[in-house]
Curated annotation (Swiss-Prot):
GO terms for biological process: acetyl-CoA metabolic process; methanogenesis, from acetate. Keywords: Acyltransferase, Iron, Iron-sulfur, Metal-binding, Methanogenesis, Nickel, Transferase. The gene is cdhC2. GO terms for molecular function: acetyltransferase activity; anaerobic carbon-monoxide dehydrogenase activity; CO-methylating acetyl-CoA synthase activity; iron ion binding; iron-sulfur cluster binding; nickel cation binding. Belongs to the CdhC family. InterPro entries: ACS_CODH_B_C, CO_DH/Ac-CoA_synth_bsu, CO_DH/Ac-CoA_synth_bsu_3_sf, CO_DH/Ac-CoA_synth_bsu_arc, Prismane-like_sf. This is Acetyl-CoA decarbonylase/synthase complex subunit beta 2. It comes from Methanosarcina acetivorans (strain ATCC 35395 / DSM 2834 / JCM 12185 / C2A). It is an enzyme of class 2 (transferase).
Length: 470
């Protein structure tokens, strides 16, 4: 192995470069970040070449954030365009093998940091680029030639980003006419387990990976060329619930790969055994109980959602490979799925989106709902959201009256509990029963005691009327 100014090992996966230990930040929420892999003819690739357009590492100022784009060109007899996204997703793996260099997210959301210790050992991104390409060709031998260009100049990054978005869109559209019921196998991905050990990403025709980078065709291509790699085949097994997207094969793999943490995953459910969330997801969904609706916030949105929480905080609550009822991480392309959270109302349950996300996915939002889904321009808190939904006649409003009626009925059923029939449970030491008003029993005489949501155990109770002293 060639000599590099930093150590290279899988042991560094999951290493975090904190702000206080950071030399520079590349991309991320404060700037632009991109990674893209392109299949090219062999004669168009200068093997192992690293090109830097813009300031190199030694020209960067400590503590600053810079725009960042990585464009990898790959070639080989077995290399084809279908493999681009597969190779692209491994960028996350191999960069994180490099000590002191942190990589998060994917596509147009890339966020990297270089530690002070690592920056002190190298004055250019060139050895970093050579190290990553060495790892690619070692782990994926079908790549025979490879070169990379790093962009750190704002205008160039913006240009590369626009071109890349068109490429990503074309990739995503390939699965539009293929659905879960049309195939016998799904695909799994464990790339994010270095950061989220119990995450089990299941990719089906109707559900893109959480990071948005792997669709069903990409999973198939990856499993074919690298059978021992992080993308693999999942036999669907028997269908348990079509609406929720539950299959025996998916449940089996969920239990196995989460080390028993979860025993089922329902692909199209928000509330019942939802898909696990890693941390690389593009969008996080959050339940708003006050309106019985679901809001969604994307990684790029810097403001607060109506619940008073921003993306980063919600991502922390949702991620880590957990199965959190009330929060759900997804890839943006899942919005285009005909099975989008169909078990819980689909689009009829969506009540809030940041305007930038709403504009981005406008073509897939049902026409009759476009004006009924609020943005930060319409609602910034729960009260204003509720008022907006009522004014626009959003479908969730109809559920509010039904829920209130059901609650009233439950309260009436619990209204009266006879003392003699009350379930008994010994109160804690020092517990004192609250004073209860004496009520006239009318023609029937006696008193009435009302206990709500109470479990009381008493060996003996004596209730007597206290007579006034004369």
């Amino acid at each position: 192995m060639a000599e590099f100014p930093f150590e290279i090992s899988p042991m560094f996966e999951g290493e975090r470069v904190r702000k206080e230990g950071m030399f520079v930040e590349l991309g991320g929420p404060k700037s632009l970040g991109l990674e893209l892999v392109r299949a090219k003819p062999m004669d168009e690739i200068e093997d192992d070449k690293v090109t830097i357009v813009g300031p190199d590492l030694k020209e960067m100022e400590e503590g600053k954030t810079y725009p960042w784009a990585m464009i990898f060109n790959i070639g080989g007899e077995l290399v084809e365009p279908d493999l681009e996204s597969v190779v692209e997703r491994r960028v996350h793996d191999f960069i994180n093998y490099c000590q002191g260099i942190m990589h998060l997210n994917q596509r147009y959301d890339v966020w990297m940091r270089v530690s002070k210790d690592t920056a002190a050992k190298m004055d250019s991104f060139e050895p970093f680029g050579q190290a990553v390409m060495m790892l690619f060709k070692t782990e994926l031998p079908f790549i025979e030639k490879m070169q990379v260009t790093f962009y750190t100049e704002q205008a160039e990054v913006e240009k590369q980003l626009e071109e890349a978005k068109a490429i990503f869109k074309a990739r995503d559209e390939r699965t539009k006419d293929l659905h879960d019921e049309d195939v016998d196998v799904f695909y799994g991905c464990t790339l994010c387990q270095s950061f989220a050990p119990t995450n089990v990403c299941v990719v089906s025709p109707d559900r893109v990976s959480l990071c948005g980078a792997i669709n069903w065709f990409d999973g198939r291509a990856a499993a074919k060329v690298d059978p021992e790699g992080p993308q693999f085949e999942i036999t669907k097994g028997d269908l348990i619930d079509a609406e929720k997207g539950e299959y025996t094969g998916v449940n089996d793999i969920a239990k196995k790969l989460s080390a028993g943490e979860f025993d089922k995953i329902k692909l199209h459910s928000f509330f019942d055994a939802p898909h696990t969330s890693c941390g690389c997801f593009e969008v996080v969904g959050f339940y708003i109980p006050e309106v019985d609706g679901i809001g969604w916030v994307n990684r790029e949105y810097q403001g607060m959602a109506p619940n008073g929480i921003g993306f980063s905080t919600m991502a922390g609550q949702t991620g880590g490979g957990k199965q959190i009822v009330g929060f759900l991480g997804i890839g943006i392309n899942y919005f285009y799925s005909p099975k989008f959270i169909q078990a819980d109302g689909g689009w009829n349950r969506v009540v809030w989106l940041p305007s930038m996300l709403k504009d981005k996915i406008a073509e897939t939002i049902p026409e009759d709902l476009k004006d009924k889904i609020a943005t930060e321009n319409d609602a910034t808190d729960i009260e204003s959201l509720k008022a907006f939904l009522q004014e626009k006649g959003h479908p969730v409003v109809a559920t509010w009256a039904a829920a209130e009626e059901e609650e009233e009925e439950e309260e009436e059923e619990e209204e009266e509990v006879a003392v003699a029939a009350a379930p008994m449970m010994m109160p804690a030491a020092g517990f004192q029963m609250p004073a209860m008003p004496m009520m006239s029993g009318g023609s029937s005489g006696g008193i009435k005691l009302t206990f709500k949501n109470a479990k009381i155990t008493i060996d003996k109770m004596i209730i007597s009327e206290k007579k006034e002293k004369k």
